[in-house]
């Protein structure tokens, strides 16, 4: 199963395929009212450090874990911009587990275990395949995560 190319941003517009084509992409299921929400700061730092080298960070709001992302698209966008200065792409809210798991997360999880909580991370190589998965407790400044990003970037 290939990486889905028909993705919709938080503001309801289609994500242009060239945004992720031939790029290294870090998908992260995010939430605004979680103990791990401060990871947004680290994701912004990763975006600044590796964005020009070909890393694309994409946040995927999800309300499946403790209803910690209840906001509307506008509320999510305002919160992330105001509190964390998020400039990377946020997709529309999605289910990452269960019978309504989005096609994106069907691809990312594959035959693996369900996502355990907010801020699970999937690193996609330039070939569009999953090269690494990191649990929610792995912070964006983790040396193993950075090493995987650098390796994928070449």
Curated annotation (Swiss-Prot):
Substrates-to-products reaction catalysed: a hydroperoxy polyunsaturated fatty acid + NADPH + H(+) = a hydroxy polyunsaturated fatty acid + NADP(+) + H2O
GO biological process, alphabetically ordered: cellular response to oxidative stress
UniProt activity-regulation remark: Mercaptosuccinate, pCMB, and nethylmaleimide act as inhibitors of the catalytic activity.
Inducing or repressing factors: High light, methylviologen, and salt stress conditions increase the expression level.
E.C. code: 1.11.1.22
Pfam families according to UniProt: GSHPx
Active site: 34
Biophysicochemical property: pH dependence: Optimum pH is 8.2.
Activity as a function of temperature: Optimum temperature is 37 degrees Celsius.
Gene3D superfamilies referenced in this protein's UniProt entry, alphabetically: Glutaredoxin
Keywords: NADP, Oxidoreductase, Peroxidase
GO molecular function: peroxidase activity
Enzyme class: oxidoreductase
UniProt family annotation: Belongs to the glutathione peroxidase family.
PANTHER family recorded: GLUTATHIONE PEROXIDASE (PTHR11592:SF78)
Function: Hydroperoxy fatty acid reductase essential for the removal of lipid hydroperoxides under normal and stress conditions, leading to the protection of membrane integrity.
Assembly, per entry: Monomer.
Designated name of the protein: Hydroperoxy fatty acid reductase Gpx2
Gene symbol of the encoding locus: gpx2
């Amino acid at each position: 199963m290939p990486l889905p190319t028909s993705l919709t941003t938080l503001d309801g517009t289609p994500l242009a395929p060239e945004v992720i084509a031939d790029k290294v992409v870090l998908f992260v299921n995010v939430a605004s009212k979680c103990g791990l929400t401060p990871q947004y700061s680290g994701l912004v730092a990763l975006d600044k450090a590796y964005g020009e080298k070909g890393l694309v960070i994409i946040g995927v709001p999800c309300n499946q874990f403790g209803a910690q992302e209840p906001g509307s698209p506008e509320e999510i966008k305002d919160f992330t911009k105001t509190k964390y200065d998020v400039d990377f792409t946020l997709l529309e809210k999605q289910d990452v587990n269960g019978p309504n798991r989005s096609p994106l997360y069907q691809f990312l999880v594959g035959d693996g275990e369900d996502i355990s909580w907010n801020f699970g991370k999937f690193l996609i190589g330039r070939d569009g395949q999953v090269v690494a998965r990191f649990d929610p407790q792995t912070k964006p400044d983790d040396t193993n995560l950075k090493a995987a990003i650098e390796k994928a970037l070449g």
